[in-house]
């Protein structure tokens, strides 16, 4: 069995690493990404920063990914929640919940570099980047994906992780919000 993941942003790259880790490389994963690893113009791994909740960091640690991200992460020790113009607020601290941090802030470009470094050595993962899906066909048993490079990939599962305007989901008439 094999899985073809189209889109190597945060969701696709993390899924590929999770499958590799949880199956110890026994399930073949093909990751197709339009941008070269470390590309400055990667839309999913740009200069934006995101906050990862403590539970997310724990899940990433469980699949062996957090260890690669921790050194570029800034811990969140306090969160202040208020609504301007309205009375009341709440302040949450990691200390009161007996946590090292409520979460961490990471820059997506750093995350992308580190995820792709891990992907290059992940058992069972084959990277196809930069490359794009030209077309695909489905049968009851499998999906065949033809890449713009001419390579053909066959798998039992096709994952559309190619962004909020997924061309793969669109071609399959998958509705989403």
Task: Go through the PLM ranges and name each one.
Residues 11, 15:
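Hydrophobic/small residue at the entry helix of a nucleotide-binding pocket
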Residues 22, 63, 122-123:
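Acidic-histidine catalytic/liganding microenvironments
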Residues 43-84:
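N-terminal FAD cofactor-binding segment of flavoenzymes
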Residues 72-171:
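Conserved N-terminal helical subregion
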Residues 175-177:
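A short alpha->loop->secondary-structure connector
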């Amino acid at each position: 069995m094999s899985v073809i993941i189209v889109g190597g942003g945060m969701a696709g790259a993390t899924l590929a690493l999770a499958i590799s880790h949880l199956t110890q490389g026994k399930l073949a994963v093909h990751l197709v990404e339009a941008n070269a690893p470390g590309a400055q113009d990667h839309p999913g791994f740009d200069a934006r920063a995101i906050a990862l909740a403590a539970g997310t960091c724990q899940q990433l640690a469980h699949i062996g990914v957090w260890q690669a991200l921790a050194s570029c992460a800034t811990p969140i020790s306090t969160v202040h929640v208020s609504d301007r113009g309205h009375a009341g607020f709440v302040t949450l601290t990691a200390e009161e919940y007996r946590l090292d941090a409520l979460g961490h802030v990471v820059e997506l470009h750093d995350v992308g570099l580190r995820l792709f470094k891990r992907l290059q050595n992940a058992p069972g993962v084959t990277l196809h980047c930069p490359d794009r899906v030209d077309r695909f066909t489905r049968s009851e048993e499998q999906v065949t994906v033809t890449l713009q490079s001419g390579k053909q990939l066959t798998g039992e599962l096709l994952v559309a992780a190619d962004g909020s305007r997924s061309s793969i989901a669109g071609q399959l008439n998958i509705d989403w919000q």
